[in-house]
Amino acid sequence: MFNGKLAQTDPELAKAIELEHQRQQRNIELIASENFVSPAVLEAQGSILTNKYAEGYPGKRYYGGCEFVDIAESLAISRAKKLFGADHANVQPHSGAQANFAVYFALLQPGDKILGMNLAHGGHLTHGSPVNVSGKYFNVVAYGVEEDTGCINYEKLREIALQEKPKMIVAGASAYARAIDFKKIGEIAKEIDAYFFVDMAHIAGLVAAGLHQSPVPYADVVTTTTHKTLRGPRGGMILCKEEYAQLIDKAIFPGSQGGPLMHVIAAKAAAFGEALKPEFKAYQQQIINNAQALAKGLLERGFNLVSGGTDNHLILVDLRGTGITGKQAETLLDEVHITCNKNAIPFDPEKPFVTSGIRLGTPAVTTRGFKEKDMDKVAEIIALTLQEKDNPDTQEKARAMVKELCDKYPLYA
């Protein structure tokens, strides 16, 4: 009874997976944190390595029979170090959030002060939000962006750091469209003798390709997810200087996790191998080109963007004054098969479940093959959908335009 294919043994679940496959094929995916992995990454993650328990690290396991999963993890580690020029890599975190928690667990004590980017200004829950463990266990001070520019003011950040003297400065964001100057923040951290921790989850692919300043030379510890712009499986990773390697490894196992997910680690190794190839840089450059083309198209059609544009893979659209909330925009776009997410903008008057903005990203559409001219067409569809929402013919017309683009660039054909 346990040897059949999923369609035979569990047709209800098989149908849900097939429907999701169809949704991914027919929708234009603009969620900035999502991407489509390669068939090789899918193959590795769906492999028999899912059967193997392997507590510990390569060569130092608490279980027998780990000689081959050791090869997979060692490949992931060596490739990650090469990709980012890091002294040490831990590829076992199950997620970016767990990687971040392990950093705090390794370097801080409850009640220590951290300085992180305000979630409402584009930061992340795990950088000190009061609803997250990082905001409950630590004394959190926040920095943000300027209301008129939508950008980080590094001099103000320095003033806060000098006044508050945090034990750790956290950099990185989940909804910030401009390049972050890690060198400058690292200098501020050195000035006050604080740890400098960077979460580069959103921009890791751009960093790997040399298209965004790398935090690795300046930070004590760097975390990332392995999906998003890196185009690997959903998971996390920690990079650090050699002096923190033992602390970080112990914070993951046995500190906060048990057995690593060896099938996911194998998929990470496959993705890192792909990222080391020359064509990966061209792919990352196209992500940026597409984001800037989408930004240009939206600006030309009357939309306001936080900070006025983008340097990376994402755009934050300010919908104030349009009569549409972020929640409404997300729903309207979903109805025409464009997937995005409502997102708070800096100094947002709306509640977090309503918001005044939407976040758009280009990694997934770039994987499909979209180019700049296609992104202008996407901007046209977004404008049509949101600006002519009361026209009864809008939905049908927009869906047809989406279908034409998706048929042009089939997914997993």
Curated annotation (Swiss-Prot):
Keyword Transferase listed? The answer is yes
Listed GO molecular functions?
Answer: glycine hydroxymethyltransferase activity; pyridoxal phosphate binding
Q: Binding residues for (6S)-5,6,7,8-tetrahydrofolate, per the UniProt record?
A: L119, G123, H124, L125, E243
Q: Name a GO CC annotation attached to this entry.
A: cytosol
Cellular compartments annotated: Cytoplasm
Catalyzed chemical reaction(s) = (6R)-5,10-methylene-5,6,7,8-tetrahydrofolate + glycine + H2O = (6S)-5,6,7,8-tetrahydrofolate + L-serine
Which ranges does the record mark as transmembrane? none
Residues bearing N6-(pyridoxal phosphate)lysine are K228
Q: Which class of enzymes does this protein belong to?
A: transferase
The UniProt keywords, alphabetically, are: Amino-acid biosynthesis, Cytoplasm, One-carbon metabolism, Pyridoxal phosphate, Transferase
EC number(s) reported in the record = 2.1.2.1
Q: What is its main location?
A: cytoplasm
- NCBIfam families annotated for this entry? PRK00011.1
Q: What is this protein called?
A: Serine hydroxymethyltransferase
